[in-house]
Amino acid sequence: MHMRLVVIAIGRLKQGPERQLAERYRERFDDIGRKLGFRGLDIHEIPESRARDAATRMAEEAAAIAAAIPDNSMLVCLDERGHNIDSATFAGHIGRWRDEGVAATAFVIGGADGLSPELRRKAKLGVAFGAATWPHQIVRVLLLEQIYRTATILAGHPYHRA
């Protein structure tokens, strides 16, 4: 069985260096991932809510995110309250889920107001990229790099030299 990886992100990456870098890591992953039992890396961009208050924005975005999560997925939330884990541990989770026959892993990146508490509770794993707060565009690039790095770790490729 092949595991599908899905990135669900609030907001759109406009043309420019962030989008180019994100695409580069996605393409690199695709080159290695298929050989490792991954069925591709899909990216779903969800428009930011235009609601006036943060609670409504977060609720609207959470509903759109929930609708985009594939059935029977492992849910990973990128969240400043998440765990700071190293790349090998991150790769270990994804590799183990693949080996256990999980159909999909969905990585969720919230908008400016973050992720709803309900989504965070449903997550199998919450991940933070350090203690700093990052713009969601940068988080997407960091996530795609870590997904590519995961593939290289699982393949024994020399990209990861830690």
UniProtKB/Swiss-Prot annotation:
- Give Gene Ontology CC terms: cytoplasm
Q: What is an example of a GO molecular function annotated in this UniProt entry?
A: rRNA (pseudouridine-N3-)-methyltransferase activity
Presence of keyword Protein transport: no
- Residue ranges spanning the membrane: these are none
Which Pfam family, giving just one, matches this sequence?
A: SPOUT_MTase
Lineage top rank: taxon: Bacteria
Compartments where located: Cytoplasm
Q: Report the SUPFAM superfamilies cross-referenced here.
A: alpha/beta knot
Per its record, the protein catalyses: pseudouridine(1915) in 23S rRNA + S-adenosyl-L-methionine = N(3)-methylpseudouridine(1915) in 23S rRNA + S-adenosyl-L-homocysteine + H(+)
Known partners and oligomeric status: Homodimer.
Tell me its family. Belongs to the RNA methyltransferase RlmH family.
Q: What HAMAP family does this protein map onto? A: 23SrRNA_methyltr_H
Q: What does this protein do?
A: Specifically methylates the pseudouridine at position 1915 (m3Psi1915) in 23S rRNA.
Q: Which protein are we looking at? A: Ribosomal RNA large subunit methyltransferase H
From which organism does this entry originate?
Answer: Bradyrhizobium sp. (strain ORS 278)
Quote the gene name from the UniProt entry.
rlmH
